[in-house]
Regions:
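Secretory targeting signatures
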Residues: 1-27, 59, 75
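Short, acidic/polar linear motifs in exposed loop/turn regions
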Residues: 63-67, 81, 111, 125
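Short proline/glycine- and polar residue-rich coil/turn motifs
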Residues: 92-101
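Short, hydrophobic beta-strand segments
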Residues: 103-111
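Short, compositionally biased P/S/T/A/G/V-rich stretches that sit at domain boundaries
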Residues: 24-51, 143
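Surface-exposed loop/edge segments in extracytoplasmic proteins
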Residues: 82-90, 128-129
């Protein structure tokens, strides 16, 4: 009986020994930094733009893991009432461990108003998708 207890203790000690104390949660695998509106050349535009002005909804995506990660960068734009007026995505980007990559989606507003762009980073899109980080948002004023 003592032998089984010691064996279990050894297995438990090995399992605890290889589990990192700093393991990332599912939503910490990537981070979304510096969300902004930019023109086609990457010049920041601020949050006030014009109707029919083509912009890029941009952010830096950081892979916080010790392994490579394929991502999908998704942006949905909502109007003041919360209705989605635009959805765009880029798939197939692979980030190396701790790599940061600037990604963007183009949008041309067709009417004036207040909008919110929500930026998501997922894996497995469009099938079996999982969030890799919390989403972030940008407020946009169109005149």
């Amino acid at each position: 009986m003592v032998g089984k207890g010691i064996g279990l203790l050894v297995i438990l000690a090995i399992a605890v020994g290889i589990t990192p104390a700093f393991a990332l949660t599912e939503l910490e695998r990537t981070s979304i930094n510096d969300p902004q509106l930019v023109n086609a050349f990457g010049t920041p535009l601020g949050n006030s733009i014009n109707v029919d002005q083509q912009i890029q909804i941009s952010a830096d995506v950081m892979n916080n893991q010790e392994k490579s990660q394929k991502i999908a960068y998704l942006v949905q734009v909502k109007d003041e009432a919360g209705f989605v007026v635009s959805v765009g995505w880029v798939v197939g980007v692979e980030l190396n461990p701790h790599q940061e990559f600037k990604q963007s989606i183009s949008w041309i507003p067709k009417e004036s108003g207040k909008f919110t762009a929500e930026i998501f980073v997922w894996e497995g899109f469009p099938i079996n998708h999982n969030a890799l980080s919390d989403y972030t948002s940008i407020q946009i004023s169109v005149s």
